[in-house]
Every structure is written in C-alpha cells, then in structure tokens.
Amino acid sequence: MKRTILMMLMAACALNGFAADEAPPREEAKLAAAEKQPALMLGDSMMRLMGKAIEKELKADGYEATTFSSIGSGLARLDVFDWFSRIDSTMKAAKPVVVVVTLGANDRQALQDGAGNVLQFGTAEWREEYGKRIGRAMDVILENGAKRIIWLELPDMKEHLHQNYADLVNAIYAEQAAVPSRKDKVFLFSMRRHLSKVPGKYTSFLMSPQGQALQIRDADGIHLSQQGAKIIAKALVDAFWRD
C-alpha cells in the first residue's frame, strides 16, 4: 500500500509541475467572454466564498453569473450527493457558456465503484475510478452546452497529507483535461501562484501593496478566507475575461 501511494504521488508531482506553473490562458479561452456570455460557478465548499466573489467581479463587468455550491460534497460519495445529476439540472437551468469548477477538496476518502466495490484511497484502483469521475463531470458540463470549462486546481494545503492529496488530485485534473475531446475546451487555473509566496509552500497571510497583512486562508488550512476568495476571483477574471 505504501509503495502504491508513493508511486501515485511521484506521478502526481511530475504532472502537477506542468499544471501548477499555469501558462497564460490561450487566446481561444477568452473568446467566450467577448459577447458577454453567461457564466456559472460550480463546486463544493471551496466554491462557497469564491463563487460569490467571482460573481461580483463578472457582474461589475456586465456579465450574467450564478453560483451553485454544496458544502461537504464531492465525487467520492455520490450516494450522499449526486453531483452528476446536480450538474445536469443546474446547467439546464442556467444555460451558461463558461463554467468555473472546483471539486475535490473533500474527496480524500474511500469510494465505491459502479459494481459496489469499495476502493480505498491511495490505491491505483481509486485513482483510476476518481479520474473517470472527474472526466465524467467535465463531459456532463460540455454535453449541456458549455463552450469553456475553467477548472480550479486545489491550492497549497497546510498539512502534509492534504498537500500530497492536492498534488495527486491536481495531476488527475490535468490528465482528464488533456483528453483529446476536452483539451481545447477545459482550461486549468492554478490558485497556488496567487495564494502562496512560493508555489508549493502554504502560507496563511500575504502582504497587500499597501503593506497590510491579509489573511487569505481559513483556519482549517484547506479553504480560502473571504480575502483569499477575492484574490482568486480578480486573478481569474483578469486572466480569462479581461484584456
């Protein structure tokens, strides 16, 4: 088991090195913004504050924007909250062209596959099944008319175990976004470069240009504070919507 987890994390770090460096958004990613097309923010508890902050930024620029977030949910326990059904119904109601997603913060746990087998976190089987779920979430969004998905990678985490998990899941995001049917439609966005003095190293505070210490992370070392959410919202909208 330890060897399996180690191999998974090594692969995650290798892949995530590409994703976390975050190349500037390709020009076609910004095309959807040109005609003031509607946007939707979807996610777990990580999206609760971010969604509202992104909405505020977009609405200030004249875009239609809505948010749906579900605290404590994820793709590991679909028996508790069926994200695929929720994505489908929310997409049909909101009819967005651009969708911003964060899912995964709560999924460091065992999951059950379609055959009823319990797959323990840290196994190759877990990684394969979880990757399929990430890919399916992307596909459901695209099948419902979205032209662009902006998938938010997990930020740096305070605890070592959570940081390793974030590295692993970010690598899975990158793998699924690179699938040929998705690669020109799904764009990854690294929160780490905006929330850490050194990407890969957790920090709770950043200094504002005015020299004020800003608390950017929640006390749990996982979620963002309201100030952190505002930082990500501005960076995201600047990158994908603004010239």
Residue ranges and their predicted role:
Residues 55, 59, 63, 92-95, ...:
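Sec-exported extracytoplasmic/periplasmic mature domains
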Residues 102-108, 137-170:
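Active-site segments of SGNH/GDSL-like serine hydrolases
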Residues 26-131:
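Conserved SGNH/GDSL esterase-like catalytic core that processes O-acyl groups on lipids
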Residues 10-17:
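Hydrophobic h-region of N-terminal signal peptides that target proteins for export
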Residues 48, 52, 56-59, 85, ...:
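Solvent-exposed, polar/charged alpha-helical surfaces in well-ordered, non-transmembrane soluble domains
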Residues 156-243:
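Catalytic His-Asp segment of secreted/periplasmic serine-dependent ester chemistry enzymes
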Residues 2-7:
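Sec-dependent signal peptide recognition
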Residues 20-21:
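Boundary of Sec targeting at the N-terminus
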